[in-house]
Amino acid sequence: EYKFNGGKEFVDDRGSITNYELPEPINWIGWIESKKGTVRANHWHPIQQQKCILISGRYISVFKDLKTPNAPMTTQLMEPGDVVVTEPQVAHTMVFLEDSLFLNLVNGEREHDNFGKHTIPYELVDERMRVELLEHYKPECRSCGNSRLECVVSLGNTPLANNLLNDENQEDELYPLQMNYCPECHNCQLSHSVPREKMFNEYLYVSSTTEVFRKHFSDTADLLTEQFGLEEGSFVVDIGSNDGVFLKPLQEKGISVCGVEPAKNLSYLAEQNGVPTINGYFEDESTLSQIKQEADLVTAFNVFAHSDNLEQITRNAFQIMKPDGHFVIEVQYLYNTLKDVTFDNIYHEHYNYWSVLSLNNFFERLDLQISNVERVDTHGGSIRVYVGTQHHLVHPSVSEFIQKEREFGLDKLETYKRFSRKVEECKEKSLKVIKILKDDGKSIVGYGSPAKATTVLNYYGIDSNSIDYIIEDNELKHGKLLPGVRIPIQGKGGVLDENPPDNILVLAWNFFDYIKENNQELVNRGCEFITLKD
């Protein structure tokens, strides 16, 4: 399914004329009025191409290619003047965000009672999904408000990445997982906003689980302490502080700290570790009011991906800072996601996907500016961004990053379309490899159950028929099931030693070397360590 607008526009003091060129003649026009909150279609046509033009209102067009096995569900927002063309054998549904009027443009017969000989019922959008789309679809750019967003890639309806299942009887909750691109400010974001409470009130990702991240945050604490002259009496606030992994090294230097963490279990862990932590969301006034001291430094590591209310978070950060304070964030780098095709970093917790270009546009709208940018080797490629008021000196790194991004094409839609095609190629290649291994009678065990594992395994359709179980170092995940594909997760224990598999599929691929080095006995016994990126 695709949409287009008219062209060859003529404008004078009477108004405007927009012309549409259709690929075939029209012999029927259907005038269709639809009320806000209702659904139409939920069907597919075996032979007839469908076309309609929206006259007024707005609706979400939902479609799925039935010719392609395991094709994902995709959405796009339709606004007045848009023509949508739905090809044969494509299931489609219309979910109306407003009272709307559209015209069906038909070439052929049109006599049928709701579902006649031209249409075949297909419940693409059930009642639960209707409500989800009406309540949580994000039609406008979170950064600039533009509603003309373009789909980059749809990974279908998938479960929440870190909401592991307790047992086989627990049902999966599925939500649309689709990344859109804003041509105006070059922000990338998810089309659907799952309520924050569903994802962050209890959280199983613990930053201190791996030595890699403990070292990263310890090194970052040393760097920022020296860079900003932090000392005893200085005060640092960390937004989304997890278990206090960044603040603890600062505490040991005699620096006063305060974490803000929405997950109750992680707040408790941090407090048990002696790190003062407020359990709440930083964008909420009730949380902000508990911070009684002005901060020399406010940090937000990977928070800018995880929030649907970034403007308020940013304003709050500067509200609690001293006039000469500093705001430092880290985000996964969109440049690396596209260049390295690390699409498994796309999941519901990550509302936003950032480049320096898009972050710069975001902060400029708040009368702030990026003063420096550094590369960070975490999560498959990240950036550390220093943000200040307009009077701060700007390091050459800012323009250097933006120039590199423009050269790569982060400001061009075709770059994102090319990424989408590469994602499809990765899926096809990986499924062939898994099939060859299983056809040869090889056993496969997963290693690591990060959020990215939920994305890639559900998108590929790889379940417990292919992967026997997943080994996980984080004890909070032991005994649970990866959602959707329902692969059991367990501790390492002695199970690998007793019956080592032929292949260990490292799902936490950003820790591949670390995991392999710490399991040399399995390498010596003939286990082959692989990733879905091989």
Tell me the role of every PLM-derived stretch.
Residues 311-326:
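A short glycine-rich, Lys/Arg-flanked "PGG" loop and its adjoining helix->strand segment in the class I
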Residues 324-332, 528-531:
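Conserved beta-strand signature within the Rossmann-like core of class I S-adenosyl-L-methionine
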Residues 95-133:
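Double-stranded beta-helix
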Residues 66-87:
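Short acidic-glycine-tyrosine-enriched beta hairpin
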Residues 1-27, 41, 132, 136:
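A short, N-terminal "cap"/entry segment at the start of jelly-roll beta-barrel domains
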Residues 379-422:
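Flexible, glycine-/basic-rich loop-and-beta segments that form/coincide
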Residues 136-212, 374:
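N-terminal juxtadomain amphipathic helix
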Residues 163, 329-352, 356-359, 363:
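Short, glycine-/aromatic-enriched active-site segment of Class I SAM-dependent methyltransferases
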